[in-house]
């Protein structure tokens, strides 16, 4: 088993220089497939404006698959239920502590499910609010006030929570912002251009942070 995980770590170390992102598919019945144009649009924005060279063919990977180790950044979203099996949780934990990064964007209604399931991934860690002076808010574009507000749901302020491993932010949970809606094609939500621009810029920060840390 140790040899197996050593192999995975070596594999991840080798490919972490590649610029790849993927959508994380999970169990539980939640719509992991929501916002289908979001990640492709963010990738194109990053390639155009922050000098990345990300593969624009976005793949989908399952939480329990070793395929996740091919991607320095995983994106997860949805509105409803999330379930991680013990194998899923162990696989995600190994991925994250080996250098991977997971961005979870609550598309509205995901919070109570994902917070419970993350306790399986990191039983001894809590989601903590990320301070506004953290590097993720300034890697490519400055957001001195933290996350931008993209969509109104409950009228609450946007929040960024994270889990840290050995001082490195390995997981970002964005709540009450709906960044992914702002990344989607303009006609999907009819967001004003300046709102979509804020969402894409914050997304570019997340991508840049994940690739460089």
Question: Where do the protein language model's features map onto the residues?
Answer:
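Solvent-exposed loop/turn segments at secondary-structure junctions
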Residues: 26-30, 79-83, 101, 108-112, ...
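Bacterial N-terminal signal peptides
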Residues: 6-13
């Amino acid at each position: 088993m140790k040899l197996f995980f050593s192999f995975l770590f070596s594999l991840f170390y080798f490919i972490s220089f590649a610029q790849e992102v993927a959508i994380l598919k999970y169990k539980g019945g939640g719509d992991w497939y929501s916002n289908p144009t979001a990640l492709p649009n963010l990738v194109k924005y990053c390639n155009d404006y922050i000098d990345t060279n990300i593969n624009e063919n976005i793949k989908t990977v399952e939480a329990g698959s070793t395929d996740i180790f091919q991607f320095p950044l995983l994106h997860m979203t949805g509105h409803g239920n999330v379930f991680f099996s013990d194998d899923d949780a162990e696989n995600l934990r190994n991925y994250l502590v080996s250098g991977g990064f997971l961005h979870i964007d609550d598309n509205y209604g995901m919070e109570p499910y994902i917070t419970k399931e993350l306790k399986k991934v990191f039983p001894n860690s809590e989601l903590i609010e990320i301070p506004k002076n953290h590097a993720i808010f300034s890697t490519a574009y400055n957001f001195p006030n933290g996350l931008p507000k993209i969509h109104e749901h409950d009228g609450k302020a946007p929040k960024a929570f994270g889990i840290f491993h050995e001082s490195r932010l390995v997981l970002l949970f964005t709540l009450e912002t709906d960044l992914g809606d702002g990344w989607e094609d303009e006609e999907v939500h009819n967001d004003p251009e300046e709102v979509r621009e804020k969402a894409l810029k914050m997304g570019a920060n997340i991508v840049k942070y994940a690739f460089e840390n």
